């Protein structure tokens, strides 16, 4: 038995898709355990770029079983569009399974998401308006529609009718918009049910049997540590649990079955949407990072905010997820900078703190305390061994290891599978 949880350690967009794709080669089962189509993964395989939002990145390996776990909220329309996209790209998807316990994103979830975000005015939290939050709200309220309900005509009809009455009251009386039509939604979603029925499974059982058989299981997280509902920069967070603990509840597996936790972390920092960002660079340096790193969201196309590496965030991610290894991404983007800065603390109210603050009020007031190190000018996109990196790049990696007390096991020097420096085995 070997199982690895792969998580994002910053605000998402760290490059998890590439690392999942890289590790999936040795895995037998790849499991997505939280989030929805608000997440985006970009994977480059055999020179081709694939953009995925819901289906695990391991789908690009035909012999791997991929599972959408119970912790995921599924928009069936998006799922079928993604399956069609992969089919057009000649990718076989016959080994995809969907948890019967996963919750379904409904049209009223998407509509309410947009209306609620727009009503916040200057207090927007940066939602993607894809219905993720409202779907998780219904899950918590115990009125959600699960995949198992969707494929049961009687259950689906009853739950949809009950929910739609409540949602239409909200839409008409609070937001002043037209109500949604029951028959139209029922017909549309019944059609989806027929198409996905053969993919539905008891995913927890599938994972359990795989582990008992000694197979290798990779749990793929979406978003990142600082977007976690409990441990992120609340309220600028997602509605699920991207940290390692989320894999247990979102996939139906006990914590003693997890062997390693790999934290995916960029060699610099990015953030999409609202909220504090101490190392943000609103200047030419930040713009250079954005252009060199192609920092535009896979899901939204929004330009990502860019800044220097923040060791405070990295240490915090290690603490809340028990990270055993880092996968350091986009080291090549830093080539050409004469000096590189690392945030090693925060200055707030004339005091320097060295732990990530819980209060957003304090976090917003934080100014970065930087350590400046030498940069490198060489193109490193073709380097395959750590010892062949420029000394300054090696020193940068080692300094991150020192500051986080965590080994950097994988280093990405480009988007391709082959552009990965391996310093130790994960599986």
UniProtKB/Swiss-Prot annotation:
GO terms for biological process: 'de novo' AMP biosynthetic process; IMP metabolic process. Pfam families: Adenylsucc_synt. The keyword Signal does not apply. GTP binds at residues 12-18, 40-42, 304, 330-332, 412-414. Keywords: Cytoplasm, GTP-binding, Ligase, Magnesium, Metal-binding, Nucleotide-binding, Purine biosynthesis. Binds 1 Mg(2+) ion per subunit. One of its GO terms (molecular function) is magnesium ion binding. It is found in: Cytoplasm. Plays an important role in the de novo pathway of purine nucleotide biosynthesis. Catalyzes the first committed step in the biosynthesis of AMP from IMP. Homodimer. This is Adenylosuccinate synthetase. It comes from Desulfitobacterium hafniense (strain Y51). The gene is purA.
